[in-house]
Amino acid sequence: MLVCDYIVKQIDGDYAHLQRTDAPEEELKVVARALLPAEIYEGCELHYELMQYEMK
């Protein structure tokens, strides 16, 4: 089970580009905004656990 934190690096229309805080060298993860909290903004932190994203 993956548990990690992300930073929203870019919002591009219906998608957000996320960077893992514990592995910044990894490729950015592209996630549909429909799966993310509505109040996200570039630079905010998200917590991922049990296939859900929450604002940190």
Residue ranges and their predicted role:
Residues 14-18:
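Short aromatic-glycine-enriched beta-strand elements
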Residues 35-47:
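Short nucleic-acid-contacting surface segments enriched for D/E, G, S/T with interspersed K/R
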Residues 50-56:
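Short, Lys/Arg- and Gly-enriched loop/turn segments at beta-strand edges
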Residues 26-37:
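Beta-strand/loop nucleic-acid-binding surfaces
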Residues 1-12:
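Structural detector for short beta-strands of small beta-barrel domains
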